[in-house]
Design a protein with these regions (language model features):
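Generic low-polarity alpha-helical segments
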Residues: 1-3, 131-132, 152, 184
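Predominantly flavin-linked oxidoreductase catalytic cores and closely associated redox partners
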Residues: 1-99, 111-112
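A general structural signal for well-ordered alpha-helical segments in protein cores
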Residues: 18, 69-72, 103, 124, ...
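Contiguous hydrophobic segments
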Residues: 19, 23-27, 34, 60-66, ...
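Electropositive phosphate-/nucleotide-binding environments in soluble metabolic enzymes
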Residues: 42, 65-66, 118, 122-125, ...
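Short, charged/polar low-complexity linear motifs in solvent-exposed/disordered segments
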Residues: 51, 67, 73-76, 124, ...
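Conserved mid-domain beta->alpha element of the FAD-binding
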Residues: 55, 94-162
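C-terminal helical "tail/cap" subdomain of flavin- and related membrane-associated enzymes
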Residues: 136-228
């Protein structure tokens, strides 16, 4: 379930969601490959990457109304792999308020998946750690519940500008003519640029939060709906 909030339309396929599906055939490959190919998916990308003794082959669509099953099966077939072990879901790709009605949200329920890549496990752990610290501070008597709600809301909201930039990238990518997109990718395929861009991407939700105290969040207006 996606938190309903004040908008009852915040449910698939009307909500800001991506749609992803992958298969897990047996096999091995040394490479991770991503295809930005409109014959596979008009708005999104296909992928293959190794995972132990199996492969992950899938299709992700930024448009939740685009059905990805047939194209996932076709991609697996084109790669000579069996379409078995299906796994997929809706992927919220827009950041939402992380508190509402006295409840703390982390992960998909708060829109913590990264909009351009749909990565969600790392971000769920990252915001989950921050949320857990606030809950612990309440249990230990260091904060009131309302203070913890406000602190966690501000922490999540302080990442909004990063999510907005990734969302802009998601919207722009399908509108770039494929040959131009290929040239842009080739031009950016330099170690210095790759290291710079990956480090910025990684630092959106760095695992260092486990051992380091997060930087104080900027002052943020907490919505009235945060309180129970």
């Amino acid at each position: 379930m996606l938190a309903a909030g004040e908008d009852p339309a915040y449910q698939p396929p009307d909500a800001p969601l991506s749609r992803g599906l992958e298969v897990h055939p047996a096999g091995q490959s040394p490479d991770l490959k991503v295809w930005i190919d409109r014959s596979i998916v008009p708005e999104g990308y296909g992928w293959i990457f190794p995972a132990g003794d199996e492969l992950r082959i899938g299709v992700g669509s930024f448009d939740p109304r685009f059905h990805v099953k047939d194209n996932t099966v076709k991609l697996a077939d084109d790669l000579g792999a069996d379409a078995v072990g299906f796994q997929g879901n809706w992927i919220p790709h827009k950041l939402r308020d992380a508190v509402e009605d006295g409840i703390f949200f982390a992960g998909d329920s708060a829109g913590h998946c990264l909009p351009l890549t749909a990565e969600g496990i790392r971000t769920a752990l990252y915001f989950g750690v921050a949320c857990g610290r606030e809950l612990r501070s309440v249990l230990e008597g260091d904060k009131t519940r309302e203070q913890a709600l406000g602190s966690y809301f501000a922490f999540s909201a302080s990442h909004e500008w990063k999510y907005k930039w990734l969302l802009r990238g998601q919207k722009i990518l399908p509108r770039i003519h494929p040959p131009l997109a290929q040239r842009i990718i080739e031009a950016g395929n330099r170690p210095s640029f790759l290291n710079w861009s990956f480090n910025h991407y990684w630092n959106i939700a760095t695992p260092d939060i486990v051992t380091a105290t997060p930087s104080p969040a900027r002052r943020t207006v907490v919505p009235a709906s945060a309180a129970a």
